Amino acid sequence: MATPQSVFVFAICILMITELILASKSYYDILGVPKSASERQIKKAFHKLAMKYHPDKNKSPDAEAKFREIAEAYETLSDAHRRKEYDTVGHTAFTNGKGQRGSGSPFEQSFNFNFDDLFKDFNLFGQNQNTRSKKHFENHFQTHQDGSNRQRHHFQEFSFGGGLFDDMFEDMEKMFSFSGFDTTNRHTVQTENRFHGSSKHCRTVTQRRGNMVTTYTDCSGQ
């Protein structure tokens, strides 16, 4: 027959297990989409939540943590290989690193992106907030890379292999109605910004040939 002490210990264990289950939300729950969600649904949910919880727009104390959580969920679910591995091993095993083992794993790839060009070209959060916006993205992905022991690759001309940045670049091209491809499957995006307090003009030139993108900034003073 169970004693009061054993019943109490059992109740505490059940409570702790319940709290752990509730605290460990799946990536689908974080983005608010069903497990059967399409790539388009996942992308749409991420963009909506990222704009809502971006620390430059949302001043609540937990906004930055929420934003990083959203970005991490999207980084996994937007990649077909990662999503399959995540669905196979489950959230707990995946986040503990069991879903990141094996030779040639897609999780070993490194994401390096020029955040200055991203925010300067598209000005998502206002010109005066570009630096802070860039830093929030940089800090998240640097932390995520360090935690996963990913190899860093430095390059100037790079290929978007899918995932967060390719999706954002593609959506922004459509949003701002950039010119289409010519016969060489290449297009150039040029933007010009006047910096406050100076007569200096800078333009960012982005050239894309297939999946290869090269971006540089050309500045001239008057």
Curated annotation (Swiss-Prot):
<protein>
    <recommendedName>
        <fullName>DnaJ homolog subfamily B member 9</fullName>
    </recommendedName>
</protein>
<comment type="function">
    <text>Co-chaperone for Hsp70 protein HSPA5/BiP that acts as a key repressor of the ERN1/IRE1-mediated unfolded protein response (UPR). J domain-containing co-chaperones stimulate the ATPase activity of Hsp70 proteins and are required for efficient substrate recognition by Hsp70 proteins. In the unstressed endoplasmic reticulum, interacts with the luminal region of ERN1/IRE1 and selectively recruits HSPA5/BiP: HSPA5/BiP disrupts the dimerization of the active ERN1/IRE1 luminal region, thereby inactivating ERN1/IRE1.</text>
</comment>
<dbReference type="InterPro" id="IPR051948">
    <property type="entry name" value="Hsp70_co-chaperone_J-domain"/>
</dbReference>
<feature type="modified residue" description="Phosphoserine">
    <location>
        <position position="133"/>
    </location>
</feature>
<dbReference type="GO" id="GO:0005788">
    <property type="term" value="C:endoplasmic reticulum lumen"/>
</dbReference>
<dbReference type="GO" id="GO:0030183">
    <property type="term" value="P:B cell differentiation"/>
</dbReference>
<dbReference type="GO" id="GO:0030544">
    <property type="term" value="F:Hsp70 protein binding"/>
</dbReference>
<dbReference type="GO" id="GO:0051087">
    <property type="term" value="F:protein-folding chaperone binding"/>
</dbReference>
<dbReference type="Pfam" id="PF00226">
    <property type="entry name" value="DnaJ"/>
</dbReference>
<keyword id="KW-0732">Signal</keyword>
<feature type="signal peptide">
    <location>
        <begin position="1"/>
        <end position="23"/>
    </location>
</feature>
<dbReference type="GO" id="GO:1903895">
    <property type="term" value="P:negative regulation of IRE1-mediated unfolded protein response"/>
</dbReference>
<dbReference type="GO" id="GO:0051787">
    <property type="term" value="F:misfolded protein binding"/>
</dbReference>
<dbReference type="GO" id="GO:0006986">
    <property type="term" value="P:response to unfolded protein"/>
</dbReference>
<feature type="region of interest" description="Divergent targeting domain">
    <location>
        <begin position="91"/>
        <end position="222"/>
    </location>
</feature>
<comment type="subunit">
    <text>Interacts with HSPA5/BiP; interaction is direct. Interacts with ERN1/IRE1 (via the luminal region). Interacts with DERL1.</text>
</comment>
<dbReference type="GO" id="GO:0034976">
    <property type="term" value="P:response to endoplasmic reticulum stress"/>
</dbReference>
<keyword id="KW-0256">Endoplasmic reticulum</keyword>
<dbReference type="GO" id="GO:0002639">
    <property type="term" value="P:positive regulation of immunoglobulin production"/>
</dbReference>
<feature type="domain" description="J">
    <location>
        <begin position="26"/>
        <end position="90"/>
    </location>
</feature>
<dbReference type="InterPro" id="IPR001623">
    <property type="entry name" value="DnaJ_domain"/>
</dbReference>
<keyword id="KW-0143">Chaperone</keyword>
<dbReference type="GO" id="GO:0036503">
    <property type="term" value="P:ERAD pathway"/>
</dbReference>
<keyword id="KW-0834">Unfolded protein response</keyword>
<keyword id="KW-0597">Phosphoprotein</keyword>
<dbReference type="GO" id="GO:0005783">
    <property type="term" value="C:endoplasmic reticulum"/>
</dbReference>
<dbReference type="InterPro" id="IPR018253">
    <property type="entry name" value="DnaJ_domain_CS"/>
</dbReference>
<dbReference type="InterPro" id="IPR036869">
    <property type="entry name" value="J_dom_sf"/>
</dbReference>
